[in-house]
């Protein structure tokens, strides 16, 4: 019986095993039949049932009714950012990698190839387009309604295994018109359809020929879940009511010399069109090469040149008609999508209205001569202008300035100056012209207008009010020899492209000052001074020092372009005592004095020549006063001299530093004053040393010679007054020594630190306090009255706090108690 039961159990177990294997096979077969990604075969727009090895995407909602989503809805990441992270297929997959890392997920996180797994990817559309039946890409372009009857919307994307991309078309108001414009019934785009121009290429066909003019929106997105982020794409298509080829300008009115962009519109992708203008619109003196450059070879331009009815002369060619025998200047542009872009160089065009014409596809440049254009537009060319921004206003003889301005129609300009007669050329540069940059500006820097060659510069070397102007260099070549003329009449100047301003020429000016400390420079051997000032019109100034013994020292200092100069640490290098200091600048004539010096030269003497004369003076036996007179006689006091000079005096002295006063910060006072413990001690003094370059150290020592404080300063004004502050909180009372040390000199004083500083200032509020510290007020009645008032509370306080025992009341109670006790005992 037992054996029979065992056999029965074995049979049942075998049956269960066979049944489970068979059921698994059936389940596998069923899943294979619904293989994810076979959307084309199943005519499905999406499939959310997945199996091991499938790809899933961010944002998807996976089916948990069958497949891996039913058997293993919770997976674990195996590597990278996803390692150890759970992927729950029972809920929609998050849309971002921040919430769900990309990577491989399997049922146990092992990463084994035999373990059921999926790969999580980010859905994206990688490319999209709208094509015409001829293959022209019109995405984002404008086409005529007649050309919009057979269009294809295509895309490449990575999530076709999950769902198709669906096409939605919206009109300018945002209304969905997809069903109205579909060429078929399918709104779903197959992956890999890019470039397709047929109904079998996987794209979606649309017919926009019956739609009104306006901008239409074509939206691509997943058919089910994938309608966000990179899984979507939006394109535009503009339908034009104009059926023929058109032409537009980015600006219909420009200044001569300004580049203009034109756009051929409503074209068919790949078609070529001729754009042309009549050569009579060019300037009379335009050359053949310039005529060939009117149309720029940019953008969608494939050819430029000039033509007559029988031949063309293209850019780079040396054969064909010339500007005298050609009829048109032209460009050939190729339509890209629905439009083509080109450009025009207007500097060779006359200032007039120019008709720009476009021809149908297939019309050549030679055929365009004498043939009516399909469309045209008028470009207005206005005469160019020039402006001179600098120099204007005031000009100082000898100074350097920048010459700059604008010229909208010129390759180069020339600068002229006028007094009362003709305009005279300013000879700037080798060819007397200034080139105009591509942004229509011109500039020459650091030009000394009064120091150039020619009559124009001579005018500006004398004070007065004149006119300075700029003119197109081609208009300044009245003689026609290829170079600007030396002079122009007023009529010649104003008839050209020109403008002018007033300019006032003034003499040079000199200011300057020497920086000393309290009128001194120290020490004698190494003392230096700083100088600064203005010397308009000068390139440099000469600084001269003369001491009382007649010794001379000097240094040349350059002047900046703004007319200022600034030089630090000029060594005086003379003997102790009074020093006379000069700052000298040559005047408008650029010569020292009358141009001659005793040591040479006989004319045209410069600052450099003057230094040789100063060396001679330094070797003779004249005293300082005589040397100063000799310098003046050869410079500013010389006949007809226009030199300029600034003179100051100071003392060259040995360095010195002293302590002048010590006081508490709350009570400023002259001299050495006591300071109470806890107050801030202010130590003030004077020096003749330069700040920053020197430091004054202050050390405070007690009666034992121990240093208790050390401070320093390198900041003081030109009056030489310095100050430091020291906290005395940790000081004991007594006499302290304060020493100031500048590195070469010291000064020492003693100061008292007291427990309480005496205050001699009294008021009605502190009269009582004052009487306790002085002899006089102690005998007054005022002192006695408060004393009596104080005694009364003192007696009360004494009674309550100093009575021995328990007090009188307690003693009486004790006596009564003792009596009663004695009476009780007696009874």
Swiss-Prot record:
- List glycan-bearing residues: 47, 117, 308, 313, 532, 766
The record lists the membrane-crossing segments as: 804-823
What Pfam families does the record tag this protein with? PGF-CTERM (PF18204)
List the subcellular locations.
Secreted, Cell wall, S-layer; Cell membrane
Task: Give a GO biological-process term.
Answer: cell wall organization
Which organism was this protein described from? Haloferax volcanii (strain ATCC 29605 / DSM 3757 / JCM 8879 / NBRC 14742 / NCIMB 2012 / VKM B-1768 / DS2)
Hey, what's the signal peptide range on this chain?
A: 1-34
Q: Give the family per the record.
A: Belongs to the halobacterial S-layer protein family.
Q: How is it modified after translation?
A: O-glycosylated on 4 to 6 threonine residues; glycans consist of Glc-Gal disaccharides. The N-terminus is not blocked.
Please list the residue ranges that the record marks as compositionally biased, kind Polar residues: 73-102
Which is a Gene Ontology cellular component entry for this protein? plasma membrane
Record's keyword annotation contains Transmembrane: yes
What InterPro entries does the annotation carry?
Answer: Csg_halobact, PGF_CTERM, Surf_glycop_sig_pep
Q: Where is this motif: PGF sorting signal?
A: 804-806
Recorded protein name is Cell surface glycoprotein
Looking at the UniProt record, the site noted as Not glycosylated sits at 404
Q: What is known of its domains?
A: The glycoprotein is arranged on a p6 lattice with a lattice constant of 16.8 nm. It forms 4.5 nm high, dome-shaped, morphological complexes with a narrow pore at the apex opening into a 'funnel' towards the cell membrane.
Where composition is biased (Low complexity), the residues are: 761-787
What UniProt keywords are attached to this protein's entry?
Cell membrane, Cell wall, Cell wall biogenesis/degradation, Glycoprotein, Lipoprotein, Membrane, S-layer, Secreted, Signal, Transmembrane, Transmembrane helix
What is this protein's function? S-layer protein. The S-layer is a paracrystalline mono-layered assembly of proteins which coat the surface of the cell.
Region described as Disordered: spans on this chain: 73-111, 755-804
């Amino acid at each position: 019986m037992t054996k029979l039961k065992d056999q029965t159990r074995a049979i049942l177990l075998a049956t269960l095993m066979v049944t489970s294997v068979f059921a698994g096979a059936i389940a596998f077969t069923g899943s294979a039949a619904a293989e994810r990604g076979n959307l084309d075969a199943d005519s499905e727009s999406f499939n959310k049932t997945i199996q091991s090895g499938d790809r899933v995407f961010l944002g998807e909602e996976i089916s948990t009714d069958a497949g891996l989503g039913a058997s293993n809805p919770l997976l674990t990441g195996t590597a990278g950012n996803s390692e150890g992270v759970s992927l729950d297929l029972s809920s929609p997959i998050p849309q971002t990698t921040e919430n769900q890392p990309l990577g491989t997920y399997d049922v146990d996180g092992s990463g084994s190839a035999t373990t059921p797994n999926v790969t999580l990817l980010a859905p994206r559309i990688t490319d999209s387009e709208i094509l015409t039946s001829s293959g022209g890409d019109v995405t984002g372009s404008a086409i005529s309604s007649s050309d919009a009857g057979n269009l294809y919307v295509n895309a490449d994307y990575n999530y076709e295994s999950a769902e198709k991309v669906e096409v939605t078309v919206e009109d300018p108001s945002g209304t969905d018109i997809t069903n109205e414009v579909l060429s078929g019934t399918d709104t779903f785009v197959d992956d890999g359809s890019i470039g397709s121009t047929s109904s079998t290429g996987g794209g979606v066909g649309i017919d926009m020929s019956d739609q009104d003019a306006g901008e239409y929106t074509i939206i691509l997105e997943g058919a089910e879940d994938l309608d966000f982020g990179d899984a979507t794409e939006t394109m535009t298509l503009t339908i034009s009511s104009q059926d023929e080829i058109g032409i537009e300008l980015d600006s219909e009115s420009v200044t001569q010399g300004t580049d203009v962009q034109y756009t051929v519109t409503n074209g068919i992708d790949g078609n070529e069109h001729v754009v042309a203008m009549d050569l009579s619109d060019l300037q009379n003196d335009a050359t053949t090469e310039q005529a060939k450059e009117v149309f720029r070879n940019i953008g969608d331009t494939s050819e430029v040149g000039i033509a007559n009815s029988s031949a063309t002369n293209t850019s780079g060619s040396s054969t064909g008609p010339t500007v005298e025998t050609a009829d048109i200047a032209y460009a050939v542009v190729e339509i890209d999508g629905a439009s083509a872009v080109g450009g025009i160089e207007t500097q060779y065009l006359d200032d007039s209205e120019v008709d720009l014409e476009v021809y149908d596809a297939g019309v050549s440049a030679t055929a365009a001569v004498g043939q009516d254009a399909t469309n045209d537009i008028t470009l207005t060319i206005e005469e160019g202008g020039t402006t001179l921004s600098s120099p204007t206003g005031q000009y100082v003889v000898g100074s350097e300035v920048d010459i700059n301005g604008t010229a909208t129609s010129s390759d180069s300009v020339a600068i002229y100056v006028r007094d009362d007669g003709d305009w005279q050329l300013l000879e700037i540069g080798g060819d007397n012209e200034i080139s105009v940059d591509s942004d229509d500006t011109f500039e020459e820097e650091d030009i000394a207008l009064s120091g150039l060659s020619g009559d124009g510069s001579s005018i500006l070397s004398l004070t007065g009010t004149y006119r300075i102007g700029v003119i197109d260099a081609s208009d300044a070549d009245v003689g026609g020899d290829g170079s600007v003329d030396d002079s122009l009449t007023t009529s010649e100047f104003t008839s050209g492209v020109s403008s002018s301003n007033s300019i006032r020429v003034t003499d040079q000016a000199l200011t300057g000052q020497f920086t000393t400390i309290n009128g001194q420079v120290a020490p004698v051997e190494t003392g230096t001074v700083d100088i600064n000032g203005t010397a308009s019109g000068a390139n440099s100034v000469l600084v001269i020092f003369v001491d009382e013994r007649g010794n001379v020292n000097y240094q040349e200092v350059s002047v900046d372009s703004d007319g200022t100069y600034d030089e630090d640490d000029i060594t005086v290098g003379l003997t102790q005592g009074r020093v006379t200091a000069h700052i000298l600048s040559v005047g408008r004539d650029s010569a020292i004095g009358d141009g001659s010096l005793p040591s040479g030269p006989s004319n045209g003497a410069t600052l450099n020549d003057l230094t040789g004369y100063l060396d001679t003076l330094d070797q003779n036996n004249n005293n300082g006063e005589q040397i100063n007179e000799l310098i003046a006689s050869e410079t500013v006091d010389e006949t007809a001299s226009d030199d300029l000079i600034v003179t100051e005096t100071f003392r060259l002295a040995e360095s010195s530093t002293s302590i002048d006063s010590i006081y508490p910060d709350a009570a400023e006072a002259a001299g050495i004053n006591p300071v109470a413990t806890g107050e801030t001690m202010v130590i003030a003094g004077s020096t003749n040393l330069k700040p920053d370059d020197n430091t004054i150290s202050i050390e405070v020592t007690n009666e034992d010679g121990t240093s208790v404080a050390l401070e320093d300063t390198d900041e003081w004004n030109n009056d030489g007054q310095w100050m430091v502050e020291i906290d005395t909180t940790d000081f004991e009372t007594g006499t302290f020594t304060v020493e100031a040390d500048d590195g070469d000199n010291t000064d020492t004083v003693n100061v008292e630190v007291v427990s309480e500083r005496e205050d001699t200032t009294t008021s009605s509020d502190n009269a009582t306090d004052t009487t306790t510290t002085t002899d006089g007020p102690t005998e007054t009645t005022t002192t006695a009255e408060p004393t009596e008032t104080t005694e009364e509370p003192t007696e009360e306080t004494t009674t309550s706090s100093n009575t021995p025992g328990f007090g009188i009341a307690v003693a009486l109670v004790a006596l009564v108690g003792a009596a009663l006790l004695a009476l009780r005992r007696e009874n």
